[in-house]
Regions:
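Short proline/glycine-enriched turn/loop segments at secondary-structure junctions
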Residues: 656-658
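Glycoside hydrolase catalytic-domain context in secreted enzymes
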Residues: 1-652, 662-676, 681
Length: 681
């Protein structure tokens, strides 16, 4: 690739650093394009010097564009095609937030593997996934694309996702670097303000997991860090990403984010933005063309920029080589990929991604006479946001899988036939957010369950029938007032193509729910942001001291904490033990716990191991998830589950941003059990 680089003119090099949509080559391919892409100010010559394409609908379209491009390419450097395969291509997996509920990286790997096959078969070589932004504010619309509020879970699942893509040859781009999930007030594109210590301690872990898994690209975020937009932030892109995280791949702007630095008022114009971008370490420009239009003149004044440009172009060429495009620019081998197993993978992942939050009478027997009410009784569009080629027309509605005596998809009580409802034994109310109420640019100020639903639940009380609510949502919602009106509560964050079958199978007990919440459900909106791994404070809450951490009008406690989730099985945890109570870094303890299924129902459960550093040189969380394992238990079976502690489980960043381990006491938590050990030098 270095020899090829030497042959390129400056204009050709800058073309390799520019991404445009396919309609620039084939006019008929102009689909769902908006904003900056519609006016990139490129002439005919420039169009055929660009190096990458944003979005493609099929492998045939890819071939069509590639053929036209290569016919006019001086060096026969193929285009590379990228797009957003977030949770599946044609077969839609659960959303990332739903996947995180499974606490099963093996299934998530398989889901990414299946998605990769379908994406490659559709003409893509790169997916803009995973979104590894740590999230703590459910008002933000993009929490549905995340793996939740825990840094360690984010690390593990980001890594599993990338490895799944990689196993099939699909390249991945982790996003959004960095700390995009901390947008103030939960508003998309808003300001982010955090310290370097906070960045290193919590917010980098997801990106680190993706990079450790082999991510090929990193996308910058729309926000600022230390008052400098991430897209032109040299500290983030060169010091943190390249030096600290050892990333060697391609960096890319988010959609038009380079030119958006003008709106941040940190760049004077296109050319100032281009100069700052290349200096900061931004390789590839998406949806704008300031590199191509501005840098030739800028280089005349500062030839040292040529070195930075060459480094960026070489990385892009190596990316194309990695994708196999130089050997076969049409990647014909991808057409024959076997995707017949995708639906089974989606079902298995969705089964473990549904969460049971309240249970008084589930599962139901098949002979139970059911009234199935609510819009999701017959809704086919249950795929969730970012569902790419997923077709809701071929998706089953819930009424197909639940044997209901009475079905009404209205959400108006007056539309119901109470005589028919009263002839049934149980009400299933399938309600919640629509797919378009979460995702990019879909933030909410109010995440309470709709008052309309509360009134509906209150009126349904007059039937005296047990009520199961199935909540379809893209975020945690406030369910405090609704909970007393509900007998059983199943929640999922959009389960994809097999949603209806999984919901029905769970209600009937064919599937025993084993999901756990990857995000905390607040009791009240005023608690936001609320997350389990909060720092200890100087005045922790005390019932006997009024001058401590509390609200006057609501409890400090969430409605449902991170990691909460019920099962039809009854699991008991006992005999939490350590192999040693005094340890050194060379001989850290093994933690063991006995888990017993005390019920007559086989089930799976995730054992979550938390650690608290009892004393440290900087404030530390009240507890942190450090390891987890998922096991299956037959009725009345017991298993001893072991965790070997590592140095990383005990480490943290100090004020100098050095990762250290300090001697002292550590507390281990598993469910309601605790134990302690001391680390000595």
């Amino acid at each position: 690739m270095k020899e090829l680089l030497k042959k390129l003119t400056l204009e050709e090099k800058l073309g390799q650093l520019t991404m445009i949509p396919p309609f620039f080559y084939i006019k008929d391919l102009k689909k769902e394009v908006f904003g900056a892409l519609t006016d990139m100010k490129l002439n005919e010559k420039s169009i055929f010097q660009t190096g990458s394409v944003l979005g493609i609908q099929s492998h045939q379209e890819m071939i069509q564009v590639q053929e036209k491009y290569l016919a006019r390419s001086r060096h026969q450097i193929p285009l590379i095609f990228m797009g957003d395969v977030i949770h599946g291509a044609h077969t839609i997996m659960p959303t990332p937030l739903a996947q995180a509920s499974s606490f099963n990286p093996n299934l998530i790997y398989k889901g990414a593997e299946a998605a990769a096959k379908e994406a490659l078969k559709s003409g893509l070589q790169v997916t803009f996934s995973p979104m590894s932004d740590l999230v703590r504010d459910p008002r933000w619309g993009r929490v549905v694309e995340s793996y939740g509020e825990d840094p360690y879970l984010n690390y593990v699942l980001s890594k599993a996702t990338v490895k799944g893509y990689k196993s099939q040859g699909l390249l991945s781009c982790v996003k959004h670097f960095a700390a995009y999930g901390l947008s103030e007030a939960g508003q998309d594109y808003n300001t982010v303000d955090l310290s370097r210590l906070n960045l290193f301690q919590y917010y980098l872990e997801g990106y680190r997991g993706a990079i450790d898994g082999g991510a090929d690209m990193v996308m910058t975020s729309f926000n600022t860090f230390e008052y400098v937009p991430a897209t032109t932030n040299k500290y983030l892109l060169r010091d943190v990403l390249r030096k600290k995280l050892k990333f060697k791949g391609v960096t890319i702007s988010d959609y038009d984010s380079l030119l958006q630095t003008i709106y941040h008022r940190t760049s004077q114009d296109d050319c100032d933005a281009a100069l700052k971008g290349i200096k900061a370490g931004l390789d590839l420009e998406m949806a704008s063309s300031s590199y191509m239009r501005c840098l030739p003149d800028v280089v005349k004044k500062d030839e040292e920029l040529l070195k930075l440009i060459d480094e960026a172009v070489l990385r892009v060429l190596q990316l194309k080589e990695k994708a196999g495009l130089f050997k076969d620019p049409y990647l014909i081998k991808h057409v024959s990929l076997d995707t017949s197993n995708s639906m089974k993978v989606a079902y298995n992942l969705a089964k473990e991604s549904i969460v049971l939050l309240k249970n008084n009478s589930l599962p139901l027997k098949k002979k139970t006479k059911i009234s199935l009410l609510g819009k999701y009784a017959t809704e086919k569009h249950v795929l969730g946001p970012w569902s790419w080629h997923g077709d809701p027309k071929v998706t089953d509605e819930l009424s197909k899988h639940l044997k209901a005596y009475y079905i009404n998809d209205s959400e108006c009580f007056d539309d119901y036939d109470l005589d028919k409802i009263n002839q049934t034994d149980h009400i299933i109310l399938a309600i919640g957010e629509r797919y378009y109420e979460s995702g990019e640019a879909h933030s909410k100020a109010d995440i309470n369950l709709s008052p309309h639903y509360l009134k509906l639940l209150e009126k349904l009380q007059q039937t005296n029938l047990p009520i199961t609510v199935v909540l379809y949502t893209g975020r945690p919602q406030i369910l405090t007032e609704a909970l007393p009106l509900i007998d059983n509560l199943l929640v999922h964050f959009h389960l994809g193509s097999t949603t209806s079958k999984v919901v029905a199978d769970t209600i009937y007990g064919i599937n025993n729910p084993c999901g756990r919440l990857p995000m905390t459900f607040p009791r009240h909106q005023g608690q936001i942001p609320i997350y389990y791994n909060r720092l200890s404070t100087g005045r922790p809450y005390s019932e006997t001291n009024p001058y401590t951490l509390k609200y006057l009008d609501v409890s400090n406690e969430p409605l449902f904490e991170f990691g909460y989730g019920l099962s039809y099985s009854k699991f008991n945890y006992s005999n939490l033990k350590l192999s040693t109570n005094v340890a050194t870094l060379k001989s850290l303890p093994t933690v063991s716990v006995t888990v017993t299924n005390e019920s007559d129902v086989s089930g799976k459960t995730s054992i979550l191991l938390y650690i608290k550093d009892d004393f440290a040189s900087v404030a530390r969380p009240v507890k942190e998830l450090k390891q987890f394992k998922k096991i299956s238990l037959k009725p009345h079976e017991s298993k001893v589950v072991e965790f070997k502690l590592t140095k990383n489980d005990l480490s943290f960043y100090n004020q100098d941003l050095k990762k250290i381990v300090e001697p002292g006491g550590f507390t281990i938590f598993i469910e309601n059990l605790t134990t302690k050990f001391t680390l000595v030098k």
